[in-house]
């Protein structure tokens, strides 16, 4: 059974010093040398999605993209245009306001290039010099990230689920997209098709594929497929009793050490599949979940938010370890760092619990639901809330100050 933990007795909400404000509020007092203090930055508009940390900056989407200094929380710049979608890669911010695509310097916000698009961009991914966009009506465009030049475009992508989670993606120089009941794999440079595979699930929500160790893993409807990355040939398939909204999570290695393919269906049942043949090693029921986030596998444990609780299972055996109950639905994906698990909830709180036993270490009560997933970098956890704020907290002690890392 589950070792139950709860967040109701987590103590009073923590106070966070205000470090910045979109309306020009006074700056916080100077921080003593060698000390880092938690900070909060309040936007003038709603904050959405998951923040991105890169090269000493925190990038947050709040209509525009805002670049904040991770040490102080002071805003370095913001974009002049709306960014409905954003990707940070190769020292650049790639964003779209819908009908246009642009690239900015991630250090100072200066514009590198901008181009119009024939359609409305709903999905944007960037990787290794390539930008891939999906447009309403089944369009797929592939761009050179350096110059903004259109390399190639295709039609015929699926239109039933035009969401960022189901849009086209790029991995290791290959562009993947769903269309016509098939998963297509095309060369990111030339657009030549490497292969396509019939997924056979018309009308079912497809997910972005996971590519690892020469295989492509993808969920479509209630099916998990493992395909050869070079040829597209099917290695195995697994049919679950219920539909899956989230992509699989892959862990290298044999099952006896926790390796495998891990998926969860919308009823909250977690499956551990053998990566060699797709055999169902174990399955464990939790609570119904609507999340499009994959389960998290870290430190020999499988973690997932389901309903209003965070569940942790042993990756090898599926044995329940612990369950932490929040006061609202878990949002996004948890993140594990230095023996702690950080996650947000619709109950307005950001939680930090012990990874081994699920004991509450600290929580922060904000003025709204947590949005996206928290991010941890160099001992700091960052999270956004529907109270229009982004928070930077000491990952160990929450709102307490910390010694700066050299």
Where are these regions (language model features)?
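Positively charged, low-complexity intrinsically disordered regions
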Residues: 6, 20, 76, 142, ...
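A short helix->beta-strand "capping" segment at the edge of beta-propeller domains
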Residues: 24-44
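A structural motif specific to WD40 beta-propellers
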Residues: 37-38, 74-77, 110-113, 149-152, ...
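Sequence/structural signature of beta-propeller modules
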Residues: 1-31, 403-406
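Generic cytosolic/nucleocytoplasmic N-terminal low-complexity/intrinsically disordered segments
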Residues: 20, 320, 324, 393-399
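Short loop/turn segments that connect beta-strands within beta-propeller blades
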Residues: 69-72, 105-108, 144-148, 187-190, ...
């Amino acid at each position: 059974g589950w070792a139950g933990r709860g967040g109701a007795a987590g103590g009073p909400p923590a106070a966070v010093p205000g470090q910045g404000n979109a309306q020009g509020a006074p700056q916080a007092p100077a921080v003593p040398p060698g000390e880092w203090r938690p900070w909060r930055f309040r936007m003038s508009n709603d904050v959405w999605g998951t923040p991105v940390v890169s090269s000493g900056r925190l990038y947050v989407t709040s209509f525009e993209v805002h670049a904040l200094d991770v040490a102080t929380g002071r805003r370095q710049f913001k974009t002049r245009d709306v960014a409905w979608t954003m990707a940070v890669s190769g020292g650049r911010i790639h964003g779209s306001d819908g009908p246009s695509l642009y690239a900015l310097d991630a250090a100072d916000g200066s514009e590198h290039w901008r181009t119009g698009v024939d359609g409305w961009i709903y999905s944007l991914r960037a990787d290794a010099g390539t930008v891939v966009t999906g447009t309403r009506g089944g369009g797929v465009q592939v761009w050179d990230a350096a110059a903004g030049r259109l390399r190639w475009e295709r039609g015929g992508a699926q239109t039933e689920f035009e969401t960022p989670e189901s849009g086209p993606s790029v991995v290791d120089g290959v562009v993947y997209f769903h269309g016509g009941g098939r998963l297509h794999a095309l060369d990111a440079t030339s657009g030549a098709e490497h292969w396509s595979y019939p997924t056979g699930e018309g009308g079912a929500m497809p997910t972005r594929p996971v590519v690892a160790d020469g295989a492509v893993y993808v969920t479509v409807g209630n099916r998990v497929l493992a395909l050869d990355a070079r040829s597209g040939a099917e290695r195995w398939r697994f049919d679950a009793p219920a539909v899956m909204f989230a992509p699989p999570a892959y862990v290298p290695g044999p099952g006896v050490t926790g390796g495998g393919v891990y998926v969860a269906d919308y009823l909250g049942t977690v499956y551990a599949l053998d990566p060699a043949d797709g055999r169902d090693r174990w399955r464990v029921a939790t609570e119904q979940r609507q999340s499009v986030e994959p389960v998290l596998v870290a430190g020999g444990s499988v973690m997932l938010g389901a309903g209003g609780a965070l569940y942790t299972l042993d990756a090898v055996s599926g044995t329940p370890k612990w369950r932490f109950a929040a006061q609202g639905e878990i949002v996004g994906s948890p993140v594990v760092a230095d023996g702690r698990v950080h996650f947000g909830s619709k109950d307005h709180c950001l939680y930090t619990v012990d990874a081994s036993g699920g004991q509450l270490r600290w929580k922060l009560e904000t003025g709204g639901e947590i949005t996206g997933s928290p991010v941890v970098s160099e001992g700091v956890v960052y999270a956004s809330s529907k109270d229009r704020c982004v928070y930077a907290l000491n990952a160990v002690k929450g709102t307490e100050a910390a010694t700066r890392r050299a």
